[in-house]
């Protein structure tokens, strides 16, 4: 099958080439009257026998124009005007003058589509039959297309002319049958069908019934050469730049874009704006330019003296928030705050240690699960402890900041506890954060109603460490996390220290959770101010 198809294609190529070089002559008909198709074929044979004036050029082209000039055939004139003037149809009268009959805009392109397909428009059949001059040739109409759109001189515009043959279609044949049978004579259905068959035989081209594949390939090749630039993709591309499409784009450019295309319109305008900007970024070659900076003389005199006070800037030192002057302790000061609570079967006990070392005015803090055997380890100062222990201590700052940390951690424990909480305090050293006696433990607590003041939001919960130091079922955080919450980069204004009752213990009811933001000194100061 593949081999037979290749042979048919080769046969079609040979037939087309031989017909272009040496076309066979047709037999003369007995009637002596030739149709327009026979005239065109005879003209084709005649032109093929002539030698071309220029080599590599053919003379057997533009046959319809040559036939019209030889026999002065009547034509339908179609004028294509530039811009928005549209197009018009002209018919020639008996006196030889052309008269314009129809003028349409380019938006109404139905007639142009028929002309492009070389078909006779059915809507023009009645108009052409009423013409003073017969323009039908074997059922076909010769149309002359005059294109004024390429002319540059608008005062006396010239045009480019070409001729096309409009062939009848089944629609035009139906119109002819209807116009012929619309007289007073009674036509039966058989008479109408017979009339239609005779019209088809008179207007149709010769039909080849040879079942050879080469005939189909030859017809396909001839049709391809004639409609090579008349395909649907090519029409779609050319239609974008047609006059009707340009007019529609111009009308839509003044209208606001739809909401779905606002982004596309913005990008298009920005692209046009950037395209209009031109920058001269040419870099001259080395040696063609003069460096004026190097050529300018540099006369700088060395000053004999410099006024330092004139150019120096003095930065004021930051004053401490403590109302009390900085005290350098003579001994180590350590305060331990132990918080105890019982929830269900769990016993929780944590310890907050505030330490001030010898020769250091700053206070340090440490939060850890309280154990009796770790009492000796907690005595070690941050400056003398190991690397692991030193990482657990965090810098608090002044004495006021240390008191604020104690208050905040106490509020945190009472807000997070689901059971009564007991706090005990013990201090050692020359001075203590509280006014109690040295080394004597105290117990105190604050009512839960006071803790709710100033809290406007309900933040995520923070859990307390268990007594064993490990988190139980993910409900408690570690001591390092709590210490990180208590750090404050900028100390807030000092707040009044709440009074703690000695050796008193108050059970707390269930309270709500507190966020890490409540641990900062700033949030604590807001609650005390409120």
Swiss-Prot record:
MF terms in GO: transcription coregulator activity
Biological processes per GO annotation: gastrulation; positive regulation of gluconeogenesis; positive regulation of transcription by RNA polymerase II; regulation of transcription by RNA polymerase II
InterPro entries the record matches: Spt20, Spt20-like_SEP
Compositionally biased spans, kind Low complexity: 424-436, 466-475, 514-530
Keywords noted in UniProt: Developmental protein, Gastrulation, Phosphoprotein
Signal sequence annotation: none
Superkingdom to which the source organism belongs: Eukaryota
PTM-bearing positions, type Phosphoserine: 296, 515, 520
Phosphothreonine found at: 490
GO cellular component annotations of the record: SAGA complex; SAGA-type complex
Span list, region Disordered: 419-530
Function noted in UniProt: Required for MAP kinase p38 (MAPK11, MAPK12, MAPK13 and/or MAPK14) activation during gastrulation. Required for down-regulation of E-cadherin during gastrulation by regulating E-cadherin protein level downstream from NCK-interacting kinase (NIK) and independently of the regulation of transcription by FGF signaling and Snail. Required for starvation-induced ATG9A trafficking during autophagy.
Assigned protein family: Belongs to the SPT20 family.
Record note on quaternary structure: Interacts with ATG9A. Interacts with MAPK14.
Protein name: Transcription factor SPT20 homolog
Gene: Supt20h
